[in-house]
Curated annotation (Swiss-Prot):
Its main location: secreted. A long coiled coil structure formed by 3 polypeptide chains connects the central nodule to the C-terminal domains (distal nodules). The long C-terminal ends of the alpha chains fold back, contributing a fourth strand to the coiled coil structure. Heterohexamer; disulfide linked. Contains 2 sets of 3 non-identical chains (alpha, beta and gamma). The 2 heterotrimers are in head to head conformation with the N-termini in a small central domain. It is found in: Secreted. This is Fibrinogen beta chain.
Length: 13
């Protein structure tokens, strides 16, 4: 799932 990361980019956690 692509969630908004801390840096402001979409990363799959």
């Amino acid at each position: 799932q692509g969630v908004b990361b801390b840096z402001g980019l979409f990363s799959a956690r």
